Design a protein with these regions (language model features):
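Helix-rich cap/lid subdomain of alpha/beta-hydrolase
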Residues: 1-27
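Hydrophobic, aromatic-rich cap/lid helix
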Residues: 27-53
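Short acidic active-site motifs
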Residues: 52-56, 106
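Short beta-strand/loop motif that positions the catalytic acidic residue
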Residues: 60, 66-68, 72
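Conserved alpha/beta-hydrolase "acid-adjacent" motif
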Residues: 73-79
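Catalytic active-site module of serine/aspartate enzymes centered on a nucleophile-bearing elbow/loop
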Residues: 89-119
Length: 119
């Protein structure tokens, strides 16, 4: 689910985990149960049609970087296209052979894309 089914994507996932666990200092704190519940509630609410939310998204005036993997089963790429199409100054990037963990799989490219976007 986090990485695409291809051998290359699965290998990139293993490498990402290796990078994460190699770091011994300055690691992020574990999230709280309340944080996890809030995330779950947000994911559940995402599937409920809300035209008012779409109108609010369309009112965003600042530049927005929308990114996703082309094989993401959690947030389907079509929703990334929809979101980017609704935000006037959105920039969309879909990473190939990647799922929900695209930013870990394509970490260097994603970091460069974010840096370029923020420049």
């Amino acid at each position: 689910m986090v990485f695409a089914a291809s051998e290359a994507s699965q290998q990139a996932g293993k490498e990402a985990l290796g990078r994460m666990y190699a770091r011994k200092e300055d690691r992020d704190e574990a999230t709280s149960w309340a944080t996890r519940e809030a995330q779950y509630d947000a994911v559940c609410a995402w599937g409920i049609p809300d035209h008012a939310a779409l109108e609010r998204v369309s009112a965003i005036e600042m530049p927005v970087f929308v990114a996703n993997g082309d094989s993401d089963p959690m947030i389907l790429p079509r929703y990334s296209y929809l979101l980017a199409g609704l935000i006037p100054q959105a920039r969309l990037k879909i990473y190939p052979d990647a799922a929900h963990g695209f930013l870990f799989q394509h970490h260097a490219e994603f970091a460069a894309d974010v840096t370029e976007f923020l420049a």
